[in-house]
């Protein structure tokens, strides 16, 4: 499933917004969540700047299709969606270099390797 919850942190913790993308279609057995044939995998790696939240989005029944990146504002509104030419394992963003996103990608041929994406 894919759910994003945003929280306001002050004297206590309050949910400021919740976005539902894919309902969690899973079975619960022996204290574990188990995927079904209907399970759509949602978000993987997350990173944030003061302005935006970035996430690897799977959006597929195959959990190995992590080649989409979404950006959201802090109210949970989707700003952009990017299709990558590689499988993105983890993300890193910078407040000073706002037009570039850095990532660790993975492939059978290269193993883990560094990539960057121009967001302009």
PLM regions: where:
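Loop/turn-rich, solvent-exposed surfaces of beta-rich toroidal or solenoidal domains
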Residues: 35-72
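Conserved beta-propeller blade repeats
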Residues: 41-46, 87-96
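Surface-exposed loop and turn segments in beta-propeller and other repeat-based domains
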Residues: 10-38, 86, 95
């Amino acid at each position: 499933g894919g759910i994003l919850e945003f929280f306001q942190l002050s004297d206590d913790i309050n949910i400021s917004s919740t976005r539902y993308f894919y309902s969690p279609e899973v079975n619960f057995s022996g204290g574990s969540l188990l995927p079904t044939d209907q399970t759509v995998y949602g978000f993987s790696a997350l990173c944030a700047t003061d302005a935006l939240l970035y996430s690897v989005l799977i959006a597929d029944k195959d959990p190995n299709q992590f080649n989409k990146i979404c950006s959201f504002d802090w109210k949970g509104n989707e700003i952009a969606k990017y299709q990558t030419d590689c499988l993105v394992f983890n993300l890193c963003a910078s407040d000073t270099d706002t037009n570039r996103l850095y990532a660790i990608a993975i492939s059978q041929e290269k193993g883990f390797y560094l990539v960057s994406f121009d967001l302009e």
